A protein has these predicted regions:
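Bacterial N-terminal signal peptides
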Residues: 6-16
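Positively charged n-region of N-terminal signal peptides that target proteins for export
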Residues: 1-4, 106
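Mature catalytic domains of secreted/periplasmic carbohydrate-active enzymes
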Residues: 20-458
Length: 458
């Protein structure tokens, strides 16, 4: 027994050392190289998240029961047996899916990249996988690869195509759910792996990731489901290195490893963790994260995967101001849609994205390629973003007296104007060099969501 334990310990130690060495090699890039790899993503600021899978079939209801929990977790919260859940594949026939239309909706909303679920926690692959028949091509009457169509269309329309991939897998044969029958509302049940199952599953996962990276050329791999106790930071570093070996320029989120703190999605700082950016979920860091790349992923209602009865929609104003708020703090906004089992993006999502797109068409310059607000604290009247030589003031609360008081930010202002009317100068008064200033504004805001004032600096 002692000999067996010693061998097991030696194997684990060697794996950890190898993982660290591979991670270090994959991460051996200069700051300039890292900045170049991250450049397009940092400039994009706005992307579409798509949660689409078998869970769209029950759409939040199983055996007449509904839940306020998220739709893509229905297999877990409804305690659906694996064999019964598999039957949803026979009903999954998204004949209304139109890749050109989906990408058009994203592009016209002002989004620059798309992240879609290639495999969520339920283990069902939304592409044609050679290592599993539990996919949309082989297991459904649809028999098409919508991911391939979407990737081609995204490239055609100029958007960067990206993948979500779940480390957690409720379907894989070597996995099983701890404490079956436990009340799901009491907390997420833990997925375990059978003896020897980890090595088997890692091989399977890496083969699927190779298919995705080599077959679809994604710009980002967005991992999730890393919280299981069998997944370690060493595993995360090894997987990060593996994916970067397949495509050195790819960007990978921090959920590949164990470096996030709950739903804050931020990288811990007690050691070097795997991943290129943090992932706050359903929240915006109050003061941003200076010096850290991050992306807030958020829903338009209360679910990621489609639920037919979830009508708690955020307004277009809230969504647009979220985008502005996130950009003002130096982050990206990954906004979710949950398509139906028929392959349609819900109408309320389409309507809101069109409204955001209308604002972005006029004001996108104040979002794309910007950096965080230059002000020491959050502005009372709205938010701000910046570029070399320019500061963009996003005015949410219009001053009733026609005077906008702007705090000092260490720069001399030489000109002020509305972004939508660049040839018409606004009056302003700046008492001291680099000091606070007062802008003269008309009685009514130009835009009810956010009027953008540009300050050109010396």
């Amino acid at each position: 027994m002692k000999r067996i334990l010693a061998i097991a310990f030696l194997f684990a130690f060697c794996f950890a050392v190898s993982a660290q060495q591979n991670f270090s090699a994959a991460n051996a890039e200069t700051k300039a190289q890292h900045d170049q790899r991250m450049r397009w993503w940092r400039e994009a600021r706005f992307g579409m998240f798509i949660h689409w899978g078998l869970y769209a079939v029950p759409a939040g209801e199983y055996n007449g029961k509904r839940s306020d929990r998220i739709g893509e977790w229905i297999m877990e919260w409804a305690n659906i047996p694996r064999a019964d859940y598999e039957k949803f594949a026979l009903q999954f026939n998204p004949v209304s899916f139109n890749a050109k239309e989906w990408v058009r909706i994203a592009k016209e909303a002002g989004m620059k990249y798309i992240v879609i679920t290639s495999k969520h926690h339920d283990g069902f692959a939304m592409y044609g996988s050679r290592v599993s028949k539990y996919d949309i091509v082989d297991a459904t009457p649809y028999h098409r690869d919508p991911i391939k169509e979407l990737a081609a269309e995204a490239k055609k329309q100029g958007l960067v195509f990206c993948f979500y991939y779940s480390i957690l897998d409720w379907h894989y044969p070597a996995a099983y759910v701890d404490a079956p029958g436990k009340d799901p509302t009491a907390g997420n049940r833990t997925t375990k792996l059978k003896p020897g199952g980890k090595e088997e599953y890692l091989k399977y996962m890496k083969e699927q990731l190779r298919e995705l990276v080599k077959g679809y050329d994604p710009g980002v791999l967005w991992f999730d489901g890393e919280w299981q106790d069998w997944w370690t930071e060493e595993d995360g570093k090894a997987l990060y290195a593996y994916v970067r070996s397949l495509k050195p320029s790819i960007i990978i989120n921090n959920r590949v490893g164990r470096g996030r703190e709950g739903m804050k999605g931020l990288s811990k700082t007690d050691q070097t963790y795997a991943g290129d950016f943090g992932t706050p979920e359903q929240q915006i860091p109050p003061s941003g994260l200076p010096g850290v790349d991050w992306e807030s992923c958020m829903t338009m209602n209360t679910t990621w995967g489609f639920k037919f009865y979830d009508d708690k929609w955020k307004s277009a104003e809230v969504i647009t101001r979220n985008l502005i708020d996130i950009a003002s703090k130096g982050g990206n906004y990954l906004l979710n849609v949950g398509p139906t089992a028929q392959g349609l993006i819900p109408a309320p999502s389409v309507e809101r994205l069109a409204a955001v797109g209308a604002w972005m068409k006029m004001n996108g310059e104040s979002i794309y390629g910007t950096t965080a607000s230059p002000f020491a604290s959050q502005l009372a009247f709205g938010r701000a973003t910046s570029k070399p030589g320019k500061v963009y003031l996003h005015v949410f609360d219009w001053p009733g007296d026609g005077k906008l008081n702007v705090p000092a930010f260490g720069k001399d202002v030489k000109r002020a104007y509305f972004l939508t009317h660049p040839k018409t100068a606004l009056t302003f008064h700046q008492v001291d060099p680099g000091g606070s200033l007062t802008l003269g504004l008309p009685s009514q805001a130009l835009d009810p969501i956010a009027t953008v004032v540009v300050l050109e600096t010396k």
